[in-house]
Amino acid sequence: MSEEELEQDELDGADEDDGEELAAADDGEADSSDGDEAPAPGKKAKAAVVEEELPSVEAKQKERDALAKAMEEFLSRGGKVQEIEPNVVADPPKKPDSKYGSRPI
């Protein structure tokens, strides 16, 4: 490739990067304008945020149905359900590593 083609490629790449930065800036402006429409900070604002993060009742029911179907298939293939004691944990806690004094002065 000639130097002119390389320079043109660099210029084209710079133009694309500018477009992405502008799009990101537009997104940032949209986010800041959304904050203006939100109610004043307080308990109601926090409650609204929590409600948005929770899945809907229909979504929960779909997950329950999918889990029930998967359990039925597992049991129909000969799978068994084992009940374990409540005080049994998968991994014992790790012994804390003391790094005090491990580095030379």
UniProtKB/Swiss-Prot annotation:
NCBIfam families for this protein: trans_reg_SutA (NF041490)
Job description of the protein: Causes widespread changes in gene expression, and plays a direct role in the regulation of genes encoding ribosomal components. Associates with chromosomal DNA through interaction with RNA polymerase. Contributes to biofilm formation and secondary metabolite production. Important during transitions to and from the survival state.
Keyword S-adenosyl-L-methionine carried by entry: no
Organism for this UniProt entry: Pseudomonas aeruginosa (strain UCBPP-PA14)
The keyword Transcription regulation appears for this protein: yes
Biased composition regions of type Basic and acidic residues, renumbered to the chain: 59-83, 92-105
Protein name: Transcriptional regulator SutA
Domain of life per record: Bacteria
Region (Disordered): 1-105
